[in-house]
Amino acid sequence: MAAEKLRRGEDLTLEEAHDAASGMLGGMGTDESAELLSLLARKGETDEELLGVLEAVSEHSERVVPRNSGTVIDVCGTGGDGMSTLNVSTACAFVAAASGCTVAKHGNRSSSGCSGSADIFERLGCDLDQRPGDAASLLEDLNICFMYAPRYHPALAGIADARKKVGGRTVFNLVGPLCNPAGVRDQLVGVSSQDLLGRIPRILHRRGAGSAMAVMSDDGMDELSTSSHGSACILRGGEVYTERVDPEALGLHASSANELRIHSAGGAFHSFVAVLDGRAGRAMAETVELNAAAALVVGGISEGLADGIEAARVAIEGGAASDLLDRFVAKAGDPGMLREARE
C-alpha cells in the first residue's frame, strides 16, 4: 500500500510511514526496501513521514536509561557537508559537559570527512561495543557518554544493501541523528541544508523536546563556524524561530574554512585533543566555543550565545575540558593513547 501511494506521488501518513519502516527494519526484501526508499527520496519526505520512520527506528533500537537528574542533551550533525573540517560536535560535547551540561553523545564514523565521532572515541581507546549499562554509568559519573550508532541500531544493518542500491541519501540518513538511544529529545543538530534547518526543531518538538536548535553556516558547514555567518533555528518555550548568527558580533574573530580543515584522521584526533587542552589555533578554539555555546543554550545552562561562549572559554582555558577528557579516558579508554596525542 505504501509503495502504491508513493508511486502516485502521494504522501504517507505517520502511521503508514511507521509501518513501512518497520517492515524494512524487520526483514523486508532488498528490492522492495530499495524501491520504498527511492520513492520517498524522489518525492521528498514530509515531517509526518520522518516522524513515522523515526518512531520505527527507535522501537528497533537498544536503549540506554540515563540515571541523571535534569536535562540530558545530544550534540550531533547530519554530516555530508563534504568539507573535512575539525570534528566540532565531539569537542563541543566535552566542552558543554565540562560547563555543566549532561551530554549523551550519539554518533558514527565519518561519512564524508576525515573523522567522525566514533573515530575519535576509538582513537581514545574506547570500546565502541560498550554495554548500555556502562554508558549510563559514565553519563552518571562524568555527565558525558558516547553511544556508537551501529551498536544501538542493529536493525539498520539489515537494510544496508537496500541503501547501497539506492545509491544516495535516504530517509534513514535524515532520521539517524535524531534516534538517540538514551531517549534524548533536546538536541543541537548541525545540518547542511536550509530545508532541514527549519524542520528539525519542529520534528523534535513533536517528539517531546522542550529545547532544540538546528544550525548551519553560510559556507556550507553543518555547524556554526567563525569562517562565515550562520543561522540557528531554535525551539524554546514551544515556539520555533530562526536567528542569524554573526560570530564577530559575539566577540569572536573571523577565520577561513581552511583554518578549520583537517587532512587526515590522525590530524583530526590531534586537533580534537588540542582544542580541549587549550592548545589549538584560535579559529578551531573559537568555532568549538561557538557551538558549545549553542549546546549550553539547548541545555538551559546559558541564556544566549554570548553567555555560552564565555562559559565555554572558561571551561577550555581553565582546564575543566581537558580534565574531563582525562577522567573520561581513565574510565573508558586508554590513557596511553591520549598521552601519545599530547606528545
From Swiss-Prot:
Top-level enzyme category: transferase
Record: residues binding anthranilate 1: 77, 108
How many cofactors are bound and how? Binds 2 magnesium ions per monomer.
Give residues annotated as binding Mg(2+) 1. 89, 223
Entry cofactors: Mg(2+)
Gene Ontology cellular component?
Answer: cytosol
The UniProt record gives the binding positions of 5-phospho-alpha-D-ribose 1-diphosphate as 77, 80-81, 85, 87-90, 105-113, 117
Q: Which reaction is the catalytic activity of this chain?
A: N-(5-phospho-beta-D-ribosyl)anthranilate + diphosphate = 5-phospho-alpha-D-ribose 1-diphosphate + anthranilate
GO biological process terms, semicolon-separated: L-tryptophan biosynthetic process
Q: Which function does this protein serve?
A: Catalyzes the transfer of the phosphoribosyl group of 5-phosphorylribose-1-pyrophosphate (PRPP) to anthranilate to yield N-(5'-phosphoribosyl)-anthranilate (PRA).
Q: Which family, according to UniProt?
A: Belongs to the anthranilate phosphoribosyltransferase family.
Record-given protein name: Anthranilate phosphoribosyltransferase
Q: What is the gene called? A: trpD
